[in-house]
Design a protein with these regions (language model features):
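Short helix-loop-beta connector
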Residues: 118-125, 147, 191
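Glycine-rich Rossmann-fold phosphate-binding loop(s) that bind the pyrophosphate
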Residues: 131-132
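N-terminal ligand-binding/catalytic initiation module
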Residues: 1-104, 112, 122
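Aromatic pocket-lining residues of Rossmann-like dinucleotide-binding sites
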Residues: 142
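Short acidic low-complexity segments
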Residues: 175-192
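NAD(P)-binding Rossmann-fold cofactor-contacting core
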Residues: 145-172
Length: 193
């Protein structure tokens, strides 16, 4: 069985390949070649566990998500989880993966696929509202989907984004891409394709 940590997943992710796999997932969804039951949720004392299984003809994927709102007081994420993969024929466990990382990269890839198919081919700038995990990954995939030269980032809080912007530039991994913090959402909208 394979066990993948956040760091290992981040080393392995290829944005173009991930977007291709998301397109394949859309094809499977459109064809109905899957079974996804309603997701059961177990709640106790303001804590939740959500189970999200999905079966295809080859594999079973299950995301188990924990929502523990009090974790923020401990400096921990209030939402966490894992992703399990099992063989469809035997049920044998194949992989356990960090759920936060898989979710962030997958959700970013969904946005990238949208940009691939719905944006102008000549887009050179993109605006990201929210300097959190999802905004980070949406920016990475926007730059993979189009020849983006400038990423504009606006965050609702006044916190210093220097470290965030540097990590984002490194993750985008294209020398000619600038990452710019906007002071107002209007500035972001005005400058974004």
């Amino acid at each position: 069985m394979i066990v993948l940590s956040k760091e290992q997943i981040e080393e392995m992710v290829d944005p173009d390949q991930m977007m291709d796999q998301i397109e394949e997932a859309y094809r499977i969804y459109g064809s109905g070649e899957f079974y996804m039951p309603p997701r059961p949720t177990v709640e106790h004392e303001n804590k939740q566990l959500m189970y999200m299984p999905c079966y295809t003809k080859d594999i079973i994927g299950t995301k188990i998500l924990s929502i523990f709102p009090e974790n923020s007081k401990l400096g921990l994420p209030s939402i966490d989880g894992i992703v399990l993969l099992n063989d469809y024929t035997t049920g044998a466990p194949l992989a356990v993966m960090d759920g936060q990382s898989v979710t962030a990269w997958r959700t970013g890839a969904v946005g990238g696929v949208g940009i691939r198919h719905l944006s102008r081919k000549d887009c050179r700038t993109v605006g990201i509202i929210g300097a959190g995990m999802q905004g980070f990954h949406q920016a990475v995939y926007a730059c993979a989907a189009r020849d983006i030269h400038t990423v504009y980032v606006f965050n609702h809080s006044d916190r210093d984004l220097t470290d965030y912007l540097e990590r984002l530039k490194k993750a985008i991994d294209k020398e000619d891409v600038k990452v710019v913090q906007c002071k107002a959402v209007e500035e972001l909208v005005r400058n974004s394709d």
